[in-house]
Design a protein with these regions (language model features):
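Bacterial N-terminal signal peptides
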Residues: 1-7
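Sec/Tat signal peptide C-region and signal peptidase I cleavage site
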Residues: 8-12
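Extracellular ligand-binding/catalytic regions of CAZymes and related secreted enzymes
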Residues: 13-28, 46-47, 57-58, 73, ...
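Catalytic beta-strand/loop cores that center a nucleophilic Ser/Cys/Thr
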Residues: 15-18, 56, 62, 91, ...
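Helical hinge/lid and interdomain linker segments adjacent to catalytic or ligand-binding clefts
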Residues: 16-21, 25, 34-36, 40-142
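Nucleotide donor/acceptor-binding cores
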Residues: 31
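A glycine-rich, often tryptophan-bearing local segment used as a flexible ligand/cofactor-contacting loop or short
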Residues: 99, 108, 112-195
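Oxidoreductase and adenylate-handling cofactor-binding alpha/beta cores
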Residues: 159-167, 185, 199-205, 211-217, ...
Length: 331
Protein backbone atom coordinates (compact mmCIF):
# COMPACT_ATOMS: atom_id res chain seq x y z
CA UNK A 1 0.00 0.00 0.00
CA UNK A 2 1.43 3.37 -0.95
CA UNK A 3 1.60 6.10 1.63
CA UNK A 4 -0.15 9.23 0.47
CA UNK A 5 1.81 12.24 1.66
CA UNK A 6 0.12 15.60 1.74
CA UNK A 7 2.71 18.21 2.43
CA UNK A 8 2.05 21.83 3.20
CA UNK A 9 4.11 24.90 2.56
CA UNK A 10 7.27 25.72 4.46
CA UNK A 11 5.06 27.51 7.02
CA UNK A 12 3.47 25.22 9.59
CA UNK A 13 -0.25 24.79 8.99
CA UNK A 14 -2.90 22.51 10.41
CA UNK A 15 -2.76 19.10 8.78
CA UNK A 16 -4.09 15.61 9.55
CA UNK A 17 -0.46 14.44 9.35
CA UNK A 18 1.17 16.68 11.95
CA UNK A 19 0.23 18.88 14.90
CA UNK A 20 0.64 22.63 15.21
CA UNK A 21 0.58 24.76 18.33
CA UNK A 22 0.56 28.52 17.65
CA UNK A 23 2.64 30.51 20.10
CA UNK A 24 1.18 33.04 22.45
CA UNK A 25 2.97 35.90 24.12
CA UNK A 26 6.47 35.26 25.38
CA UNK A 27 10.14 35.48 24.41
CA UNK A 28 9.65 32.86 21.69
CA UNK A 29 7.06 34.87 19.79
CA UNK A 30 7.68 34.61 16.05
CA UNK A 31 10.09 31.69 16.31
CA UNK A 32 9.33 28.16 15.12
CA UNK A 33 10.32 24.89 16.84
CA UNK A 34 9.87 21.54 15.09
CA UNK A 35 9.72 18.42 17.28
CA UNK A 36 10.25 15.08 15.51
CA UNK A 37 8.90 12.00 17.28
CA UNK A 38 9.64 8.59 15.79
CA UNK A 39 10.77 6.02 18.33
CA UNK A 40 9.40 2.64 19.32
CA UNK A 41 10.26 2.36 23.02
CA UNK A 42 10.06 5.58 24.99
CA UNK A 43 6.64 7.04 24.07
CA UNK A 44 7.88 10.21 22.39
CA UNK A 45 4.58 10.29 20.48
CA UNK A 46 3.09 11.35 23.82
CA UNK A 47 5.93 13.44 25.23
CA UNK A 48 6.66 15.70 22.26
CA UNK A 49 3.10 17.08 21.95
CA UNK A 50 3.27 17.72 25.71
CA UNK A 51 6.54 19.64 25.30
CA UNK A 52 5.12 21.55 22.33
CA UNK A 53 2.17 22.72 24.43
CA UNK A 54 4.53 24.03 27.12
CA UNK A 55 6.76 25.79 24.60
CA UNK A 56 3.82 27.45 22.86
CA UNK A 57 1.66 28.39 25.86
CA UNK A 58 4.28 29.38 28.43
CA UNK A 59 7.09 30.55 26.15
CA UNK A 60 5.41 31.84 22.99
CA UNK A 61 7.04 29.58 20.38
CA UNK A 62 5.15 28.33 17.34
CA UNK A 63 5.53 24.56 17.49
CA UNK A 64 5.05 21.78 14.95
CA UNK A 65 5.15 18.10 15.93
CA UNK A 66 6.07 15.67 13.15
CA UNK A 67 5.48 11.93 13.59
CA UNK A 68 6.92 8.74 12.19
CA UNK A 69 4.02 6.98 10.48
CA UNK A 70 3.26 3.64 8.84
CA UNK A 71 1.99 3.06 5.30
CA UNK A 72 -1.55 3.92 6.43
CA UNK A 73 -0.41 7.28 7.75
CA UNK A 74 -0.87 6.21 11.38
CA UNK A 75 1.52 7.05 14.18
CA UNK A 76 2.94 3.59 14.72
CA UNK A 77 5.55 2.94 17.44
CA UNK A 78 5.16 -0.80 16.82
CA UNK A 79 6.96 -0.76 13.45
CA UNK A 80 9.97 -3.07 13.54
CA UNK A 81 13.46 -1.72 12.90
CA UNK A 82 15.24 -5.05 12.32
CA UNK A 83 13.98 -8.05 10.31
CA UNK A 84 12.03 -10.56 12.39
CA UNK A 85 10.74 -14.02 11.55
CA UNK A 86 7.99 -13.57 9.00
CA UNK A 87 8.31 -9.76 9.04
CA UNK A 88 10.38 -7.42 6.92
CA UNK A 89 11.43 -3.91 7.82
CA UNK A 90 9.30 -1.33 6.05
CA UNK A 91 10.28 2.25 5.42
CA UNK A 92 9.29 4.80 7.99
CA UNK A 93 7.95 8.13 6.83
CA UNK A 94 7.87 11.50 8.55
CA UNK A 95 5.28 13.66 6.77
CA UNK A 96 5.91 17.38 6.93
CA UNK A 97 9.69 17.53 6.93
CA UNK A 98 9.36 20.55 4.65
CA UNK A 99 8.54 22.39 7.87
CA UNK A 100 12.26 22.25 8.70
CA UNK A 101 12.80 25.04 6.18
CA UNK A 102 11.15 27.52 8.55
CA UNK A 103 12.43 26.01 11.81
CA UNK A 104 14.60 27.98 14.22
CA UNK A 105 15.21 24.84 16.31
CA UNK A 106 14.61 21.11 15.84
CA UNK A 107 14.20 18.54 18.62
CA UNK A 108 14.86 14.95 17.53
CA UNK A 109 13.49 11.87 19.32
CA UNK A 110 14.09 9.18 16.72
CA UNK A 111 15.25 5.57 16.87
CA UNK A 112 16.73 3.34 14.15
CA UNK A 113 14.62 4.75 11.34
CA UNK A 114 14.74 3.56 7.75
CA UNK A 115 13.72 6.67 5.85
CA UNK A 116 13.39 7.35 2.11
CA UNK A 117 16.33 9.25 0.64
CA UNK A 118 14.24 12.39 0.03
CA UNK A 119 13.36 12.59 3.73
CA UNK A 120 16.93 11.99 4.85
CA UNK A 121 18.06 14.75 2.51
CA UNK A 122 15.67 17.21 4.16
CA UNK A 123 17.09 16.33 7.58
CA UNK A 124 20.65 16.77 6.32
CA UNK A 125 19.78 20.14 4.81
CA UNK A 126 18.68 21.32 8.24
CA UNK A 127 21.60 19.94 10.26
CA UNK A 128 24.04 21.43 7.74
CA UNK A 129 22.33 24.83 7.89
CA UNK A 130 24.06 26.06 11.03
CA UNK A 131 20.78 26.21 12.94
CA UNK A 132 20.55 24.55 16.38
CA UNK A 133 19.17 21.14 17.24
CA UNK A 134 18.53 18.97 20.27
CA UNK A 135 18.73 15.17 20.44
CA UNK A 136 16.93 13.24 23.19
CA UNK A 137 17.34 9.66 24.44
CA UNK A 138 17.41 7.29 21.42
CA UNK A 139 18.13 10.05 18.91
CA UNK A 140 21.84 9.26 19.14
CA UNK A 141 21.00 6.02 17.29
CA UNK A 142 18.19 7.66 15.40
CA UNK A 143 18.75 6.18 11.94
CA UNK A 144 19.26 2.66 10.60
CA UNK A 145 20.99 3.93 7.48
CA UNK A 146 23.60 6.62 7.03
CA UNK A 147 22.38 10.10 6.36
CA UNK A 148 23.50 11.33 2.92
CA UNK A 149 25.98 13.69 4.53
CA UNK A 150 29.63 13.98 3.57
CA UNK A 151 32.15 16.69 4.33
CA UNK A 152 35.32 16.76 2.22
CA UNK A 153 34.31 13.40 0.78
CA UNK A 154 34.06 11.70 4.20
CA UNK A 155 30.82 10.20 5.49
CA UNK A 156 29.63 12.01 8.61
CA UNK A 157 28.46 9.91 11.55
CA UNK A 158 25.26 11.24 13.13
CA UNK A 159 25.70 10.06 16.71
CA UNK A 160 29.42 10.07 17.27
CA UNK A 161 30.48 13.11 15.24
CA UNK A 162 27.46 15.40 15.05
CA UNK A 163 25.94 14.77 18.48
CA UNK A 164 29.10 13.82 20.36
CA UNK A 165 27.99 10.39 21.51
CA UNK A 166 26.73 7.12 20.06
CA UNK A 167 24.64 4.55 21.91
CA UNK A 168 27.13 2.01 23.28
CA UNK A 169 24.86 0.12 25.63
CA UNK A 170 22.94 0.45 28.87
CA UNK A 171 25.09 1.47 31.82
CA UNK A 172 23.39 -0.73 34.36
CA UNK A 173 20.15 -2.69 34.23
CA UNK A 174 17.83 -1.92 31.33
CA UNK A 175 14.26 -1.22 32.51
CA UNK A 176 15.35 -1.91 36.10
CA UNK A 177 17.51 1.06 37.13
CA UNK A 178 16.65 4.75 37.09
CA UNK A 179 18.75 7.90 36.78
CA UNK A 180 19.49 10.73 39.19
CA UNK A 181 20.83 13.75 37.31
CA UNK A 182 23.16 16.24 38.98
CA UNK A 183 24.52 19.42 37.47
CA UNK A 184 28.29 19.49 36.98
CA UNK A 185 29.41 21.84 39.79
CA UNK A 186 31.76 23.86 37.58
CA UNK A 187 28.87 24.56 35.17
CA UNK A 188 26.28 25.55 37.80
CA UNK A 189 26.10 29.09 36.37
CA UNK A 190 25.64 28.04 32.74
CA UNK A 191 22.36 29.39 31.31
CA UNK A 192 21.16 25.92 30.27
CA UNK A 193 20.98 24.84 33.93
CA UNK A 194 19.48 28.09 35.23
CA UNK A 195 16.70 27.12 37.64
CA UNK A 196 17.28 23.40 37.03
CA UNK A 197 17.02 21.08 40.02
CA UNK A 198 15.74 17.64 40.98
CA UNK A 199 16.43 15.80 37.72
CA UNK A 200 15.24 12.21 37.95
CA UNK A 201 13.83 9.74 35.46
CA UNK A 202 12.98 6.06 35.56
CA UNK A 203 15.00 5.27 32.44
CA UNK A 204 18.54 3.96 32.81
CA UNK A 205 21.84 5.65 31.97
CA UNK A 206 23.26 5.24 28.46
CA UNK A 207 26.95 4.72 27.82
CA UNK A 208 28.08 6.84 24.87
CA UNK A 209 31.85 6.32 24.92
CA UNK A 210 34.23 3.46 25.69
CA UNK A 211 35.31 2.78 29.25
CA UNK A 212 38.50 4.60 30.09
CA UNK A 213 37.76 7.43 27.68
CA UNK A 214 35.52 10.50 27.85
CA UNK A 215 33.21 12.65 25.79
CA UNK A 216 34.81 13.71 22.50
CA UNK A 217 36.76 16.94 22.28
CA UNK A 218 34.46 19.91 21.98
CA UNK A 219 31.70 18.42 24.16
CA UNK A 220 30.99 20.00 27.54
CA UNK A 221 29.21 17.80 30.09
CA UNK A 222 26.45 19.63 31.97
CA UNK A 223 24.68 16.87 33.88
CA UNK A 224 25.99 13.63 35.35
CA UNK A 225 23.67 10.63 35.50
CA UNK A 226 24.03 8.34 38.51
CA UNK A 227 22.39 4.91 38.12
CA UNK A 228 20.07 4.10 41.02
CA UNK A 229 19.31 0.61 42.32
CA UNK A 230 15.61 0.82 41.45
CA UNK A 231 12.98 2.84 39.63
CA UNK A 232 12.03 5.26 42.39
CA UNK A 233 13.58 8.69 42.96
CA UNK A 234 14.67 7.89 46.52
CA UNK A 235 16.37 4.58 45.65
CA UNK A 236 20.02 4.23 46.62
CA UNK A 237 22.75 4.88 44.06
CA UNK A 238 24.44 1.89 42.50
CA UNK A 239 27.92 2.50 43.88
CA UNK A 240 29.42 -0.08 41.52
CA UNK A 241 28.56 2.11 38.53
CA UNK A 242 30.23 5.46 37.94
CA UNK A 243 28.09 8.42 36.91
CA UNK A 244 28.24 9.21 33.20
CA UNK A 245 27.28 12.36 31.30
CA UNK A 246 23.58 12.41 30.39
CA UNK A 247 23.51 15.97 29.01
CA UNK A 248 26.13 17.98 27.16
CA UNK A 249 26.50 20.70 24.57
CA UNK A 250 28.82 21.30 21.65
CA UNK A 251 29.11 23.07 18.31
CA UNK A 252 28.81 21.29 14.95
CA UNK A 253 30.87 22.67 12.08
CA UNK A 254 28.87 22.35 8.86
CA UNK A 255 30.14 21.73 5.35
CA UNK A 256 30.25 25.50 4.78
CA UNK A 257 32.02 26.21 8.06
CA UNK A 258 28.94 27.41 9.92
CA UNK A 259 28.71 26.61 13.62
CA UNK A 260 25.50 24.99 14.86
CA UNK A 261 24.76 24.74 18.56
CA UNK A 262 23.94 21.16 19.57
CA UNK A 263 22.55 19.76 22.82
CA UNK A 264 22.24 16.06 23.55
CA UNK A 265 20.42 14.54 26.52
CA UNK A 266 20.30 10.77 26.83
CA UNK A 267 17.43 11.01 29.27
CA UNK A 268 14.03 11.82 27.81
CA UNK A 269 11.59 8.94 27.95
CA UNK A 270 7.91 9.77 28.25
CA UNK A 271 8.01 9.08 31.97
CA UNK A 272 11.36 10.88 32.44
CA UNK A 273 9.69 14.05 31.19
CA UNK A 274 7.33 14.05 34.14
CA UNK A 275 10.36 15.61 35.88
CA UNK A 276 10.04 19.40 35.84
CA UNK A 277 13.81 19.64 36.25
CA UNK A 278 14.39 17.67 33.07
CA UNK A 279 11.78 19.66 31.16
CA UNK A 280 13.42 22.92 32.22
CA UNK A 281 16.85 21.62 31.21
CA UNK A 282 15.65 20.81 27.69
CA UNK A 283 13.67 24.03 27.28
CA UNK A 284 16.63 26.10 28.50
CA UNK A 285 18.82 24.25 26.00
CA UNK A 286 16.45 25.34 23.26
CA UNK A 287 16.82 28.99 24.27
CA UNK A 288 20.60 28.59 24.40
CA UNK A 289 20.66 26.92 20.99
CA UNK A 290 18.84 29.86 19.43
CA UNK A 291 21.15 32.38 21.09
CA UNK A 292 18.44 33.51 23.52
CA UNK A 293 20.39 33.03 26.74
CA UNK A 294 19.31 36.41 28.08
CA UNK A 295 15.68 35.23 27.97
CA UNK A 296 16.30 32.20 30.19
CA UNK A 297 14.85 32.68 33.65
CA UNK A 298 14.76 30.33 36.60
CA UNK A 299 11.05 30.89 37.12
CA UNK A 300 9.33 30.86 33.72
CA UNK A 301 6.77 28.07 33.82
CA UNK A 302 7.56 24.59 32.57
CA UNK A 303 4.28 23.27 33.97
CA UNK A 304 2.44 20.64 31.95
CA UNK A 305 -0.53 22.03 30.02
CA UNK A 306 -3.59 19.85 30.51
CA UNK A 307 -3.24 16.16 31.32
CA UNK A 308 -0.13 14.07 30.70
CA UNK A 309 -0.20 10.35 31.45
CA UNK A 310 2.55 8.68 29.42
CA UNK A 311 2.52 4.94 28.96
CA UNK A 312 5.49 3.02 30.32
CA UNK A 313 8.50 2.43 28.12
CA UNK A 314 9.04 -0.90 26.45
CA UNK A 315 8.38 -3.15 23.49
CA UNK A 316 5.63 -5.31 25.04
CA UNK A 317 3.06 -3.31 23.10
CA UNK A 318 -0.05 -5.39 23.78
CA UNK A 319 0.53 -5.30 27.54
CA UNK A 320 1.28 -1.57 27.50
CA UNK A 321 -1.62 -0.65 25.25
CA UNK A 322 0.57 0.76 22.46
CA UNK A 323 -1.26 0.58 19.12
CA UNK A 324 -1.16 2.55 15.85
CA UNK A 325 -3.28 5.70 16.07
CA UNK A 326 -4.11 8.70 13.90
CA UNK A 327 -2.08 11.84 14.48
CA UNK A 328 -5.19 13.55 15.86
CA UNK A 329 -5.16 11.17 18.85
CA UNK A 330 -2.11 13.00 20.20
CA UNK A 331 -3.41 16.57 19.99
Amino acid sequence: MALVLSYGSAHAEDSPQWLTYPGGEGPGKGKHIVLITADQEYRSEQSMPMMAKILSKHHGFNCTVLFGVNEKGEVDPTMIVHPEKGREVKEHHIPGLEQLASADLVIFVTRLLTLPMAEREMIVKYIDSGKPFIALRTANHGFNTDLPYKINGKQVNWGREILGGDFMGHHGRWHADSTRGTVVPELKDHPIVRGVSDIWGNSDVYRTYKEGTSLPAGCTALVWGQPLMGRNPDDAPNTELEPLPVAWFKNWQTSEGKSARVFQCTMGSGTDLQSAGLRRLIINAGYWGMGMESDITATRSVDIVGTYKPLESGFNYAELGVVPKPVSAYK
